[in-house]
Amino acid sequence: MNEAAVEIRGLDFAYESGRPALRAVDLTIRRGECLGLLGPNGAGKSTLLLHLNGVLRGRGQVRVLGMETKRVHLKEIRRRVGLLFQDPRQQLFLPTIEEDVAFGPLNAGWSGEEAHRRVARVLERFGLEPIAATSPLRLSTGEQKRAALATVLVLEPELLAFDEPSAGLDPAGRRDFIEIVRALSQTKVIATHDMELAYELCGRIVVMDHGRIVADGPRDAILGDAGLLSAHRLERPLSMVLREMTLRDA
């Protein structure tokens, strides 16, 4: 089996305005890996995520789970790649949470019985059963985030791509979400400004700026390089700094 979940070679992409968003991106992500994608606003992080399931298609080669992101493969890729948007309301558009979660299985061609079984299981897993009949508009941001993740995980994808998953969450909601993501065994790509989240969850860090990958390496090496991070408008995680101070003073 190919050990690479994602293989990207020479990827360039520009929006209709002509502004380049990705420039000569080369990236391999191994199966089972949790990769943190960091960078300032406009670095190209979200644009790169949207290439993983063919929402955007630039020049170059993108292979996901052994398939090129060409039209012939897009249905299968989108079934096996789950993308969680920064704003959960982009994924919650039906009258109730239960209907939103059921939308994917029913449109994937599964029987009503199989879809119901999967929906019930994922609602229970994320503690959404008590609010299953509730409109997404009446939920807190944390509940909306969990519901949006449920709409993705009900399809049992092999690769998960998160765009700013902690945005808008209060401390308790953020902690709950981190623990949910930590428990997931799938290959994960997390685009975020939340340095603490990246430090907690990701074993490998990629830094992007101006559409290019400017650094790629083990978590501690990248997040420990204050000069590198400062050059790209990022900061070291405070918990990492405090841990080093504690060890130094011990």
Locate each region found by the language model.
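Helix-to-loop junction immediately C-terminal to a conserved catalytic motif
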Residues: 53
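Conserved ABC transporter NBD signature motif
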Residues: 60-69, 77
